[in-house]
Amino acid sequence: AINILAEKYPEMKSNTGIAILGGHSEEIANQLALPTYPLGYINDESKIISIYNAVESFVLPSLEDNLPNTIMESMACGIPCVGFNVGGIPEMIDHQVNGYVARYKDSEDLATGIHWVLEASDYKQLSENAVHKVSIEYSQHNVAMSYIEVYNQAISTKK
């Protein structure tokens, strides 16, 4: 998707960089047409927060994922997200509300989503919506209440 993005929007080559987190970041960086910053695996929470606060979008090109913590973390920092319509990702990213949900395995749509978040959207509103979604749906209290509800339903069906 990054190479498609660079081809469709050549002006992004001069004002867009890609920070890559996780294993194999060096290997991936050498394959991309935009400037890259391979950061490797980071488990220091304060460094992760600093990285989220330094970027304008979080892209998760995963082809299978349930409820990725990385999306919650980035949205909590006000960072709009882009990901494929797979697993729990579309439950977390509200399409064109707090990010962009691309068609499954469609790299061109993923590139469109990245461009839309960075250039065509009301970025401030996306950012506010991301924080709001996380604070409402993924707060410790709400998650705990969801578990309690599941347990209560399980208990009531056994009676």
Question: What is each model feature region?
Answer:
Residues P80-G83:
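Short hydrophobic beta-strand element within catalytic cores of glycosyltransferases
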